[in-house]
Amino acid sequence: DFVITSANLEQLNSTVNGVSYFKVNKEEAKTLDILEDLDFNIDKTLITLNGWLRIVPPDKCKKYNIYNGHPGLITKYPELKGKDPQQRAWDNIDNYNEVGSVVHRVVEEVDAGEIICEEKISTKYIGSLDATYDALRTTSFTAWYRFLKERLYN
């Protein structure tokens, strides 16, 4: 298992509890070419995108097991696909009875891959843009937890 990130984490370029952490620059991260230079079996590796906000090249979508978290309930509201779903969810909060997040497989088209899991919450608890962000953050964490628990422990 490994994590590739452009973030500054204490664990970078080391292995902690069997998980390897690699620091990459933005150019490497954009193309995911760094994956082919690493010494492990990429075919069995699970790659997750968290706040990636970049288009993954089509050849990488087909070649790797890549999953994305999206803070918009695109199963019910497909108009939330793409950039800034939190703001768009808040802008339409009066028309929605729930908001949520999904984890989906990454394919060539943005946010169009198979939905693996979703988490949602009623909009009756949401009264501001900040509350919308909080609700989507919470549902995102829960969706990722369920997804990873199923993939890693079943």
Please report, for each region that a protein language model flagged, where it lies by residue.
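One-carbon transfer enzymes
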Residues: 1-154
